[in-house]
Amino acid sequence: MKLTCVLIVAVLILTACQVIAADEAEATNRAIKRGWFGEESSCWWCTGFNKCCEAAAVCQSVNSACP
């Protein structure tokens, strides 16, 4: 019984670590696309529920189409 509990806890911890690592990787990819690491980007400041339309150099709602 103790071994089962230990295994369940270990699986939960490993799953949580994978989720955290995936979130960090996704955030890093978004940051690179937005130019936070030295890359030139016209809308590095575009955050939240907004998206960057590089061609028009505008930051607008994710629900709007890029011009």
From Swiss-Prot:
Describe, from its UniProt entry, the tissues in which this protein is expressed: Expressed by the venom duct.
Any coiled-coil regions, as ranges? none
Q: Which residues form the signal peptide?
A: 1-22
Quick one: where is this thing mainly located?
A: secreted
Localization of this protein = Secreted
User: Which cysteine-cysteine pairs are annotated as disulfide bonds in the entry?
Assistant: 43-53, 46-59, 52-66
Q: Name one GO cellular component term.
A: extracellular region
Tell me the GO molecular function terms.
toxin activity
Entry keyword set: Disulfide bond, Knottin, Neurotoxin, Secreted, Signal, Toxin
Question: Per its database record, what is this protein's job?
Answer: Probable neurotoxin.
Q: What is known of its domains?
A: The cysteine framework is VI/VII (C-C-CC-C-C). The presence of a 'disulfide through disulfide knot' structurally defines this protein as a knottin.
The similarity comment for this entry is: Belongs to the conotoxin O1 superfamily.
State the protein's name.
Answer: Conotoxin Cal6.35
